[in-house]
Regions:
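Non-catalytic terminal/accessory regions
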Residues: 1-220
C-alpha cells in the first residue's frame, strides 16, 4: 500500500489503534456527505487505512483491519448517521474478509433502522474490469501493470509499479482517469525505444498483481 497523505496520517500519530475510531468517525462526518462517486469513497477509505498504518505507531495492515473490526464497526453502527452508514459500506468494500463481513452486517442493521444509503452504495467494490496493459523497460527490471475499470460510464485506471530488482515488490500504486493515464503512457513509450507498452489479458494482469502483493512493498 502506498503511504497515506501525511496530513491525514498526522491525525492518528498520537493515538494507539484502539483509540482512533472517534477520529475516523469525525473525518467521515466531515467528508463522506460530499462524495458522490464510488471511486472517491474507495480511495478515501484506502487513505484512512493507510493513515492508520502510518500514524498509529506503524501498525501492520492486518492489525489495523482487526482493530477496525473490533472498535470502528461497532462505533459506526451505534452512531447510525448517514455518514456512519457510508463508512460501513466503504469498510465492507475494501476490508479484510472479517472486516467486510462485520461491516456489511452492521450496515444492514443501520439501514433497517431507516437510515438511507449513499447513492454509490450499490456500486462500491464492484467495478467492471476493462482492458489491461503492461509497461516496462526492455531489461525487465521494473514494470507497471495497468488495469482499467469502471462504474457505469466513468472509467478509471489502476497502475501498480513493480520493482523486479527488489524481489518483485510493489514500489508505487496510483489511480487516475483512464484516458489521461493511458495517453501519458503511450507518449512515453513512443519516445523511448527501451520502453515496452503492450496490452495483456486480465488474467495475466491479475496473476502479476497477485505475485506482487504476495512479495510485499519496497521499503520506503
Amino acid at each position: 500500500m502506498a503511504q497515506a497523505d501525511p496530513d491525514i496520517a498526522a491525525l492518528f500519530a498520537p493515538l494507539p489503534p484502539a483509540q482512533a475510531s472517534n477520529v475516523v468517525l469525525s473525518e467521515a462526518r466531515e467528508v463522506l456527505g460530499h462524495l458522490h462517486r464510488p471511486i472517491d469513497a474507495e480511495l478515501w477509505g484506502s487513505d484512512i487505512i493507510g493513515a492508520l498504518s502510518d500514524g498509529t505507531h506503524g501498525a501492520d495492515v492486518p492489525d489495523i483491519m482487526a482493530e477496525l473490526t473490533a472498535s470502528l464497526v461497532p462505533a459506526a453502527e451505534e452512531s447510525a448517521t448517514p455518514e456512519a452508514l457510508a463508512l460501513l459500506r466503504i469498510l465492507a468494500a475494501i476490508g479484510s474478509p472479517a472486516l467486510t463481513a462485520a461491516a456489511a452486517e452492521a450496515a444492514e442493521r443501520v439501514t433497517a433502522g431507516g437510515v438511507a444509503d449513499p447513492d454509490w452504495a450499490a456500486a462500491i467494490g464492484s467495478p467492471t474490469v476493462g482492458k489491461c496493459w503492461h509497461y516496462g523497460d526492455v531489461g525487465g527490471r521494473q514494470e507497471s501493470i495497468t488495469v482499467s475499470f469502471g462504474y457505469g460510464d466513468a472509467e478509471h485506471a489502476l497502475s501498480v509499479l513493480i520493482d523486479h530488482g527488489r524481489g518483485g515488490k510493489i514500489k508505487d500504486a496510483w489511480v487516475d482517469d483512464a484516458e489521461g493515464l493511458l495517453d501519458k503512457t503511450w507518449m512515453a513509450a513512443e519516445n523511448d525505444p527501451l520502453i515496452v507498452f503492450e496490452p495483456i489479458e486480465p488474467a495475466d494482469a491479475r496473476a502479476r498483481l497477485e505475485n506482487a502483493v504476495a512479495a510485499g512493498e519496497c521499503p520506503s
